[in-house]
């Protein structure tokens, strides 16, 4: 059983945020029955409006949990999950467009996919793609989704240095003032995204 409590004004990006950003107090309790054991309590996460923040730590310290709580506070937002979540039988293009802004047409989405995944057949089923290609399709989907924040949970897993750096460059080019929240165990990922605001768990 999990109980979540949040307080504050939420982690908003451009819309509805104070000029210096916003914060949320996050709490998480776990257990089989009440009283539940606190796993996270009184943590205030502040991300500047349009800013870039990294949550860093080893596997199992709660980075994904923290990002999931933050995602609930900053909706609407887009997210790249640690475990790739795509529709296997749908095409790369259909997956990229699944929550895209209505102003995004298929040709624009296809161009982004080809930029992130050089040589990809955008009409190929996701099941036919490699793990690294799937990861980049998910990054494309997140960038095409509307919202005030982009949340990335270990987004470069399985990518080599060149692919990571190329993806990071595209992410930075397309943020368009949105808040960026990254979780990673590798400081190189934060540097690739020009993040200097780092929280260590």
Question: Across the structure, where does each feature detected by a protein language model lie?
Answer:
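The feature captures the beta-strand-to-loop junction immediately N-terminal to the Walker
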Residues: 56-58
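Conserved ABC ATPase "signature" region
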Residues: 9, 106-121
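ABC-family nucleotide-binding domains
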Residues: 153, 160
């Amino acid at each position: 059983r999990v109980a979540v409590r949040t307080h504050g004004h939420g982690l908003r990006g451009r819309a509805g945020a104070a000029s210096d950003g916003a914060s949320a107090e996050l709490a998480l309790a776990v257990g089989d029955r009440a009283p539940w054991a606190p796993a996270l309590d009184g943590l205030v996460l502040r991300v500047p409006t349009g800013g870039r923040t990294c949550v860093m730590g080893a596997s199992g310290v709660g980075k994904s949990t923290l990002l999931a709580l933050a995602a609930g506070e900053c909706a609407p937002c887009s997210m790249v999950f640690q475990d790739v979540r795509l529709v296997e039988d749908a095409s790369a293009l259909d997956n990229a467009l699944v929550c895209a802004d209505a102003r995004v047409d298929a040709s624009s989405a296809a161009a982004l996919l080809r930029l992130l995944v050089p040589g990809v057949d955008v009409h190929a089923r996701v099941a036919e793609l490699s793990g690294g290609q799937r990861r980049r399709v998910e990054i494309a989907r997140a960038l095409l989704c509307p919202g005030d924040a982009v949340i990335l949970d270990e987004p470069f897993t399985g990518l080599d240095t060149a692919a990571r750096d190329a993806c990071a460059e595209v992410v930075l080019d397309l943020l368009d003032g949105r808040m960026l929240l990254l979780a990673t165990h590798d400081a190189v990922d934060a540097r690739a995204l020009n993040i200097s605001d780092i929280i260590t768990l």
